[in-house]
Amino acid sequence: VRAKSFLILLLVMPLTAFANAAIQEFKLDNGLKLIVQEDHRSPVVVSQVWYRAGSLDEVNGKTGVAHVLEHMMFKGTKQVKAGQFSRLIAAAGGKENAFTSTDYTCYFQQLEKSHLPLSFKLEADRMANLQLTDEEFAKEIKVVMEERRWRTDDKPQSKVNEAFQGAVYRAHPYSRPVIGFMNDLENMTADDAREWYNNWYAPNNATLVVVGDVKAEEVYKLAKQHFGKLKPKVLPVRKPQVEPQQIGARRVVVKAPAKLPYLLMGYHVPALTNPDTDWEPYALEVLAGVLSGNPAARLNQRLVRESKLAIDASAGYDLMARGRQSIFALDATPSEGKTVADVEAALIEQIENIKESGVTAEELERVKAGVIAADVYKRDSMFYQGMQIGTIETIGFSWKILEDYPNKLRAVTPEQVQAVAKKYLLKDNLTVATLDPQPIDPNAKPQGKPHVH
């Protein structure tokens, strides 16, 4: 399932960050957007380059190419040899990495503020001058396949998640795993990665987010110095793909060695489209919080603590999606002696209770207070401040919607929460994936291994 809830990301840091921090937005002549959030608590800076290119933009037969290119971006340019990017950042006392999702690919560094020019120099260089050789690709694609084995093939719940995505989405690109299918990775070529890089890696398809002990105007000058000379590209036309309405429940069973069964179920729901007028996504966000937003939420109370049907149970919803499609998901691990059927029935019972009886004002206030209470927490993560800005901008909205997010949540009524449950959490709109545990071979060894750039 995609990120479980944008609410979680907001809880990492206080909402006052956006009310009080100085945020400035710039745009270079080549189309690169720069957003700077000044944070002068410590002499540190976080720099993130976000490309609007993720698995959403891939085509069948080349799944995983966005993530493969992320790996290849560390393989050097004419000026910087393979692996030297990471060594230069480390030598400056910094940290760096990258990640790929359905909607974007992001590269980031965290450094002492005087080293921001190094970050900009390296990122601008590889934005335009990546040397993607057949030799380096042949080595790195094997690393990616190992990562796929480690992330998915070795993990029963990951297998369920992948099967669920393929079942819940039949036409939409969100059906494809970000890491790619193994067959596609085995048949991928360096030319496929080069094509991806040439199509999407351009200043007019990127957002540069800087958070830290800096002055916005100085960062703008530095960005123009390093990124301003890069040429924009004519980007491929993105063809919208809409998932047809589901007209009947779907089920998929995954058999894999595991200790316990597992249940993952979800309903098609809308993602945020118009931040000014949409109310349903905010009501769905609150509904997820009512079910699983805190220890007193319904699923934990009813399924885990009272009936002891499940070891854990949760609900989640991501209102931010560039593909403008989302899933209201629920998952649970049955307690020993209980079945996935027991847990599924209990989850649906909780949903039906909300559809029939609604939610209490107390529950609603508890969920809303969870977000508002984040105001009292000390801001300690520049990285997540950048994450929020970069995610929203890359998805296609303005970071400014964060300022109104708490007000949107406050405005949600019990009637609206009940209304979205009645409208979307329907039997014919349901997809269920379950793990059927098979005996574990005590001599079996993991197939894959993790990767760090």
Regions found by a protein language model. Give the residues of each.
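M16 family metallopeptidases and their MPP-like homologs
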Residues: 37, 42-68, 82-127, 157-183, ...
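His/Glu-based metal-binding/catalytic segments typifying zinc-dependent metallopeptidases
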Residues: 149, 166, 235-296
